[in-house]
């Protein structure tokens, strides 16, 4: 019986290998430029599209795969990508694209509904792709590969997807952004990226540029049109009431020392109250900052586990309330909603026109913040 099972497994593996071999031809890859990231800039009456592509070498090119930056112009992103295909002699494939970046002049001056529609309606483009905007041009951003010594697209995606929750920065993907521009208040946000040059410490390559990305701010949009920027200080308040975002830090005076307290987990509730206003209830679970994030233990563990005094907890609560209130006032000032205030009304009244048209300025908000020790 065991022998029959082994034979069956071998035959099954062989059949699967044949099916894959038939449906996946080497020429399919050789004829394609696989796009890792796209950048879109305004260039007069046209768009300048920058792509970081991963393409197998052929002809006189180096054997193997490599990443390079390619640019093309067009009236639309679709046209620019077609031009890109003509320039490279290979089909431009968006199926593996993980990042889209809008340059400053493009996202602040132009309605980019056509670009969003093109990407979201594409069968091959991933709805989970990260989408963001940047200060300066997207073309310049993608040309920072040398300074980073690695792929710009993969570096940014890793930051936005993996690190964002650890450093209290909300992040967005294509599907979420598309929905935010069509539902309720039709407002949403994109992470704002900026490149910061740093001093070169490499003695062997003193002329090589070096730097890093900062992504501590967001830009707000309504129906794919720019509304305002939310700076790093205001983004702290936004992060405190954004679900699945942790890592906010607070500096508190504790006796004769400054203590850093970090948010490890939280619970956020947004609901209507009896006065038909919105109550935002935030429960933060905090602990003193540790030298490591995996909590594997060590000689300092017993000291780090000591309880946080109530005075420090009260200080954290006060700081958190101030940061959230500051952000909420800014929301009302520019009349946008990226913290689900309108969603609270929809749960009770449905998607009625008055719910969607309700001004954020007219929504009374009650904030409740509770801080617990881990």
What are these regions (language model features)?
Residues 2-374:
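Membrane-proximal alpha-helical signals and transmembrane carboxylates
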């Amino acid at each position: 019986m065991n022998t029959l099972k082994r034979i069956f497994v071998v035959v099954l593996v062989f059949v699967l290998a044949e099916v894959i071999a038939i449906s996946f031809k080497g020429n399919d890859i050789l004829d394609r430029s696989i796009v890792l990231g796209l950048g879109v800039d305004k260039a007069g009456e046209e768009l300048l599209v920058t792509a970081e592509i991963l393409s197998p070498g052929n002809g006189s090119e180096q054997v193997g795969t490599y990443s390079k930056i390619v640019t093309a112009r067009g009236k639309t992103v679709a046209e620019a990508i077609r031009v890109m295909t003509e320039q490279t002699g290979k089909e431009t494939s968006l199926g593996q694209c993980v990042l889209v970046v809008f340059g400053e002049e493009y996202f602040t001056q132009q309605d980019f509904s056509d670009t969003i529609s093109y990407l979201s309606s594409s069968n091959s483009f991933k709805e989970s792709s990260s989408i963001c905007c940047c200060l300066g041009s997207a073309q310049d951003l993608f040309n920072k590969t040398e300074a980073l010594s690695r792929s710009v697209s993969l570096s940014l995606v890793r930051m936005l997807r993996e690190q964002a929750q650890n450093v209290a920065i909300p992040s967005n993907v294509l599907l979420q952004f598309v929905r935010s521009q069509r539902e309720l208040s039709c407002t949403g946000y994109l992470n704002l990226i900026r490149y910061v040059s740093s001093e070169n410490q490499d003695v062997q390559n003193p002329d090589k540029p070096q730097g890093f990305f900062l992504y501590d701010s967001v830009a707000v949009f309504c129906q794919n049109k720019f509304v305002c920027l939310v700076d790093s200080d205001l983004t702290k308040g936004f992060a405190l009431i954004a679900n699945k975002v942790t890592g906010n830090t607070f500096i508190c005076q504790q006796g004769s020392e400054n203590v850093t307290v970090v948010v490890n987990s939280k619970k956020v509730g947004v609901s209507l109250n009896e006065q038909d206003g919105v109550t935002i209830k935030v429960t933060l679970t905090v602990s003193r900052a540790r030298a490591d994030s995996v909590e594997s233990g060590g000689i300092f563990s017993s000291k780090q586990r000591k309880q946080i005094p109530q005075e420090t907890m009260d200080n954290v609560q006060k700081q958190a309330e101030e940061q959230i209130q500051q952000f909420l006032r800014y929301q009302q000032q520019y009349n946008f909603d990226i913290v689900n205030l309108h969603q609270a009304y929809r749960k009770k009244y449905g998607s009625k026109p008055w719910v969607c048209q309700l001004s954020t300025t007219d929504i009374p908000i009650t904030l409740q913040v509770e801080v617990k020790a881990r």
